[in-house]
Amino acid sequence: MRFRCYLIFSIFSDSLLGAGFFQGGKRAMVVSTPIAAEEKPPIQANVVETWEISKIYRTGFWMNQKVESLKPLSIAVQQGETFGLLGPNGAGKTTLLKILLGVIRASGGRGTLLGKPIGDRQTKQRVGYLPENAYFYDFLTAWEFLDYIGSLFQIGKQERQRRILAMCDLVGLAQKTAKKKQLRQYSKGMLQRVGMAQALINDPEVVFLDEPMSGLDPLGRYQVREIILSLKEQGKTIFFNSHILADVEQICDRIAILARGELLCSGSLAEVLGNDEGYEVVLKGGEEEALGKYLANLSQEQDVWHGHYQGDVQALVDALPSLNARLISMNLARPSLEDYFIRQLRERGITTSQ
């Protein structure tokens, strides 16, 4: 029994215990008082904030070679925000997450998490974390595993049972399966659901998710999106890495793009992609001179015209008969996040992952 407990404890040292999540004892009770009419509420500090934070690894036989995994980087994530960190493999996304969680130390710069310096033990009681590659003890059931994680957070037995049941419902894990089936028999997608449940069992204020969609089928991805949106409705802050840009575009309030350890851009989707200004129009028929009065950047491929239109859509549709043209398609001109992401990498000559 001692040997098994030691195994469980050491297996999760990187993803959970190494981050110090279970240090610091019980939570203190917070008593809120109403704000007087003449008083102004305090300004809400950013949940996550970094100032020129960086990470350099030393390699080689004599440890005399340096690899700059993360160049000086400054970001801020606000209360209740869903923040997506994007980048190709080797961009430094997981490195940044581990620095924020206190799993590894930064080489330079500083940062805060929930208003406290990175690494504060009491703060880690208020944080949830799903690693990209979580290590599970094969011979435990999901219920036993979640019960163990809850006990590390010093959650009482009855409350643990209630939360485990709620987490299984939330992530779509059948109660019978959770109690009877050992984790070694789970598929990758099912293990990801268990990992999501353990990240939320302590009812965290901020949740860090490293590739939460990894290994999930379309239904599983939909369920994870719904979980993230429900957490957002509860006022929780979500910080996650993902390669699935379509999901990021649906979920995130703000994003940042990393490549080779460098921050390329950050901001809201409207700031990064631009507002919906105009339409990309495809027409068939008509004359160039007449169409040019309506469409900018007009070009022709075979007998089809492509151009950019700004103005009232109905006005263009009404003018088509007089132009002797037929509308083939009309789409908002704003690029997709995937198009923007690829363009940012190509502009910097980045064609492969590092």
From Swiss-Prot:
Source domain of life: Bacteria
GO molecular function, one term: ATP hydrolysis activity
The family this protein is said to belong to: Belongs to the ABC transporter superfamily.
InterPro entries: AAA+_ATPase (IPR003593), ABC_transporter-like_ATP-bd (IPR003439), ABC_transporter-like_CS (IPR017871), ABC_Transporter_VariousFunc (IPR051782), P-loop_NTPase (IPR027417)
SUPFAM superfamilies: P-loop containing nucleoside triphosphate hydrolases
Pfam family, one: ABC_tran
Protein name: Uncharacterized ABC transporter ATP-binding protein sll0415
Keywords: ATP-binding, Nucleotide-binding, Transport
Domain ABC transporter, first and last residues per copy: 48-285
Lineage: Bacteria, Bacillati, Cyanobacteriota, Cyanophyceae, Synechococcales
Sequence positions that bind ATP: 87-94
Organism listed in the record: Synechocystis sp. (strain ATCC 27184 / PCC 6803 / Kazusa)
